[in-house]
């Protein structure tokens, strides 16, 4: 029988609860009693604080699924895990330490990363290797840290301070669209 996946969920560096894979493809999120007793807020509007687990019968709850990388970053992260097929839950556990927003997902038994699967001459892919960030969306982006006016990729187990966005050959108008809508 395969081991079921699980991870610890943090909200603003406070341990909030457990995300668990259950038999049959279900995934549950359960708030930890210390988080509930501490009077902390819900980690999401769709996941109110309560003692009973939040159950998603078909994989990750949409809140957690929306934290998983997409596009080129998802592909690079899958290659880095060294397997042809990787589930969304596996990606979230492996790279959810630094998600956009206040949530971190920590894998108690982190996966070994296979850098042999990446193009180490590509700065974007090299940055994937040095970070465990998960950023959703089709536009190429990386979690970065600003130090004295200089930006560099976030390192493993280091929270980012900014998100760097890059042009996309597949979506050439994204940068202009973002500029015009801000």
How would you label these PLM feature ranges?
Residues 1-182:
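Phosphate/dinucleotide-binding and metal-coordinating scaffold of catalytic cores
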